[in-house]
C-alpha cells in the first residue's frame, strides 16, 4: 500500500550579523562584504555600520535589511518627502546628491571601462515636469491619488512631492479635491500632469463616460487653474476640453507636442544634453547627420540648425509626424524624418542609402543591436550614443570599439536624482 507523507516545512533561521558598508551601488543600496561575497543592504551608506538580517543568500551575493543602524554617515540626508520609504518613486533621498552622482558615475565607469569625464545635472529638487498619478476610489472610502508603493500595486496617497516641478506640486491638493467631488470617481484610472512652456497640462484617463455635470465641473476647474485639460476615455483617444496645444522651447526652436508624446522629464538636463551632443559632434555647415531613434526631433531639429542635412529615423508614426510639423513650423527645410522599425533589417530602408558624416542615436532600454552593423558600415567620423541602460550601452559600445572606434568622452546624465535610474552619453571617434 502506498504511503504519503507531508514534507516537513523548511525553517530558515534569519541570521543577524554586524557589517560595515564600504560602497554604494547605482541603485542606492549599501554594499558590504560577508562570507567573501557582496551583501546588498538598502538604506545603508558607506562608512555606516549596522546590525542586519540576511533575507536572501545566493551563491554570488546576498541581501539583508537593517535591524539597527549603529552610526550615521556624513553623507546621510534627511528625506524631504514624508512618503519616502513607502512610495516607489524615489529610492535615494537619504543620500547626499554628491554621493548619488559619485556612485552612479563609478558604476558607469566600471561598465564602460572608461573614466566619466562629465556629470550633467540640474537642480536635484522640483525637476520633474511630467508625472502620472494613479487613481482609485474604493467603496465608501476617500479617493486615492498618488504613486505606487515600492514593489506593489497599492497606491500611496501623495499630498506633496518635492521632485515635481513646483507648479505641479502646488496643484496636487486642488486636483484631488476636484476629482473627489465628481460623481464618476470610481471610473477614473489615472491623471497625468505636464509642465510645458505653454503652461500646465492635465490628462485624465477614465474608463466609462463622464456625466455632463462632471465634464462641466472639470472644465470650470481647468479655467480657474489656468491649465489645459484633456480627457482620455480610451488609450488611443484624446479629447480636448480646454487650453492650447502644448509646446516647449529648445535651442531657439519652439517644439509642439501631443499631451501623450514622450518628452524628457528633466528639462534642465535635457537642454544641457542636447547642447553637449551638438558640441561633441562638432556639427559643421557641410555635415550630413543621422539621428536614430529620434522621437519627435529632440536632437534632430537643433542639429538641423547647424548641419547641411539631417535625417531622423523613428518607429512611432505619431512622433515622426510631429517632427515633420515642427520642422516646417521652425522653417527647417534640410531635415527629413522616416518612420521605420530599427529592430528590423535596416539595410533595405530608404534612409540607409545615404552617406553620413556623423551619427547620433538615443535608443530605448533594449539598446541598438539591430543598427550597430550598419552604423559601422557608414564609417561616420563621430558617433554620440545617448543611453538609458548602461548594460546595453556597454554591449553596443564593444561593437564600435572592435570596429576601430574609441571612447573619447563619457558623461553621466543625472536625469532622475534620488532614483536608481542611470542615464549617460558617450562620444566615439573613428581612429
Curated annotation (Swiss-Prot):
CDD domains in the record: AdoMet_MTases (cd02440)
Gene3D superfamilies from the UniProt entry: 2.40.50.1070, Nucleic acid-binding proteins, Vaccinia Virus protein VP39
Catalytic reaction annotation: uridine(1939) in 23S rRNA + S-adenosyl-L-methionine = 5-methyluridine(1939) in 23S rRNA + S-adenosyl-L-homocysteine + H(+)
Entries under SUPFAM superfamilies matching the protein: Nucleic acid-binding proteins, S-adenosyl-L-methionine-dependent methyltransferases
Catalytic site positions: 388
Role of this protein: Catalyzes the formation of 5-methyl-uridine at position 1939 (m5U1939) in 23S rRNA.
Protein name according to UniProt: 23S rRNA (uracil(1939)-C(5))-methyltransferase RlmD
Classification lineage: Bacteria, Pseudomonadati, Pseudomonadota, Gammaproteobacteria, Enterobacterales
Amino acid at each position: 500500500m502506498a504511503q504519503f507523507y507531508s514534507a516537513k516545512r523548511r525553517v530558515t533561521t534569519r541570521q543577524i550579523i554586524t557589517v560595515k558598508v564600504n560602497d554604494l551601488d547605482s541603485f542606492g543600496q549599501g554594499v558590504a562584504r560577508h562570507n567573501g561575497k557582496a551583501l546588498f543592504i538598502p538604506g545603508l551608506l558607506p562608512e555606516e555600520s549596522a546590525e542586519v538580517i540576511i533575507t536572501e543568500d545566493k551563491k554570488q551575493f546576498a541581501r539583508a535589511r537593517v535591524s539597527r543602524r549603529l552610526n550615521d554617515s556624513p553623507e546621510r540626508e534627511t528625506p524631504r518627502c514624508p512618503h519616502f520609504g513607502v512610495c516607489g518613486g524615489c529610492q535615494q533621498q537619504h543620500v547626499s546628491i554628491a554621493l548619488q552622482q559619485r556612485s552612479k558615475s563609478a558604476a558607469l565607469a566600471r561598465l564602460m571601462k572608461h573614466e566619466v569625464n562629465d556629470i550633467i545635472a540640474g537642480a536635484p529638487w522640483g525637476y520633474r515636469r511630467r508625472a502620472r498619478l494613479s487613481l482609485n476610489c474604493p467603496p465608501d472610502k476617500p479617493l486615492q491619488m498618488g504613486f505606487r508603493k515600492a514593489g506593489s500595486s497599492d497606491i500611496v496617497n501623495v499630498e506633496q512631492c518635492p521632485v515635481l516641478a513646483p507648479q505641479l506640486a502646488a496643484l496636487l491638493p486642488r486636483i484631488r479635491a476636484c476629482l473627489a467631488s465628481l460623481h464618476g470617481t470610481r471610473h477614473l484610472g489615472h491623471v497625468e500632469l505636464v509642465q510645458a512652456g505653454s503652461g500646465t497640462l492635465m490628462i485624465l484617463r477614465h474608463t466609462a463616460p463622464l456625466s455632463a455635470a462632471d465634464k462641466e465641473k472639470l472644465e470650470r476647474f481647468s479655467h480657474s487653474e489656468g491649465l489645459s485639460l484633456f480627457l482620455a476615455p480610451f488609450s488611443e483617444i484624446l479629447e480636448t476640453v480646454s487650453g492650447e496645444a502644448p509646446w516647449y522651447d529648445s535651442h531657439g526652436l519652439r517644439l509642439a507636442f501631443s499631451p501623450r508624446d514622450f518628452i524628457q522629464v528633466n528639462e534642465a538636463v535635457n537642454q544641457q544634453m542636447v547642447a553637449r551632443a551638438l558640441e561633441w559632434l562638432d556639427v559643421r555647415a557641410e555635415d550630413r547627420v543621422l539621428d536614430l531613434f529620434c522621437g519627435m526631433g529632440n536632437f534632430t531639429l537643433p542639429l538641423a540648425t547647424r548641419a547641411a542635412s539631417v535625417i531622423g529615423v523613428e518607429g512611432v508614426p505619431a512622433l515622426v509626424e510631429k517632427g515633420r510639423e515642427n520642422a516646417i513650423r521652425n522653417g527647417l527645410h534640410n531635415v527629413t524624418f522616416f518612420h521605420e522599425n530599427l529592430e528590423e533589417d535596416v539595410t533595405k530602408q530608404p534612409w540607409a542609402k545615404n552617406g553620413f558624416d556623423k551619427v547620433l542615436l538615443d535608443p530605448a532600454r533594449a539598446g541598438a543591436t539591430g543598427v550597430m552593423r550598419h552604423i559601422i558600415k557608414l564609417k561616420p567620423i563621430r558617433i554620440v550614443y545617448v543611453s538609458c541602460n548602461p548594460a546595453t550601452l556597454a554591449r553596443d559600445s564593444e561593437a564600435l570599439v572592435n570596429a576601430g572606434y574609441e571612447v573619447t568622452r563619457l558623461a553621466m546624465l543625472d536625469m532622475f536624482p534620488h532614483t536608481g535610474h542611470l542615464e549617460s552619453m558617450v562620444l566615439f571617434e573613428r581612429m
